[in-house]
Amino acid sequence: MKFRSLFLSALCGLAVSTAFTSCSDDKYDPFEYGSNVALPEHRGLVLNEGSFQKNNASIAFFDAVMDTTTKAANDLYLIQNKKQLGDTGQDLIVEDNNIYVSVYGSSYVAKLNKAGIEQARKSFGSDLGQPRYLAECDGFIYVTTYGGYVVKLNANDLSEAGKVKVGPAAERIDEENGILYVACGSTLDGQPDKRMFIIDTKNFTDAATKSVDVCDNTQIVCATDNYVFIQGYGADWTNTPLWVYDIKSGKPEDTGEYATYVIEGENDNKAFAVFSKTDWETYETINTYFVYDASTKTKTDVTSKITSAASALANATIYSLSEGENGSFYITTSLYSAGNGTVYHFDSNYKLLGSFTSWGQSPKKVVVM
């Protein structure tokens, strides 16, 4: 025990040099939950998608208070489980101090404890299709698959508790007030789809499942109390339309705007979005950032606020948007196989709070614990 005490003291000194603040709480054990590495008390996680079929998906950790990460590369899943996460990290959510991750290429969903140590795993065979995105509601994890299902898993042990049939290429899923909203895109072999499925978690059956036609090749759904913001790749994969579904009236509407990624904004009527447009002759990308208010059907351009704080975000390859705490949000950029991505953290007033490496290729999702 004396050795451990000395080791922790030394570790606190090291944490200062890496800007971690966890050691400020004498009661906090940076090795809690059986961790093999010292972890900051208030931490964030970055899911790096990696490169397809390269088995290099990873989860990196960072100090969510200071927006700092380690000086040397960190791969939390590898450190804790002594094996690679797998091929193509798809989605990551946190619920009740547990981490749930879907790995598309490796065809499984795993439950990790707060330290990132695997507790349970659900493999997906050809009958269900490969897993895509995740949502949680009332003790269950809901998984979309490329077999055309939303699969219901018990959050404790990932045992299967049911499934409903949706479109063949089910993509993002979001939950609001016990209702699941599911985007269904076009299939890899070109079969078109433009439906958003609506599923009541209290009546999780094929018969009760509904759908509504929205934009072509639907990809993203972002649900609030009042609206669902919907993004698609469009019929030709070039212009990426932004639609809004009014939950009360049950009517979808094309906003006339384009978006590449979208997340919930500062209230239940607003979404924050980015539209990335690339000129394939010059390979120059121009990013436009905006807030869309569904209640007033108005767009507010905030590009200058974002790019004045982080000039790289004017032309970088944007890979994801993620919601943070207290109205903050994360923007990630990718260099694909050329190097690590970068994470940018902004507050609700578009002030840059910090930026740091993702320690992996193509950061797909950021969450805070």
Kindly give the residue locations of the regions a language model identified.
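Short glycine/acidic-enriched loop and turn motifs that connect beta-strands
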Residues: 50-54, 106-108, 148-149, 186-191, ...
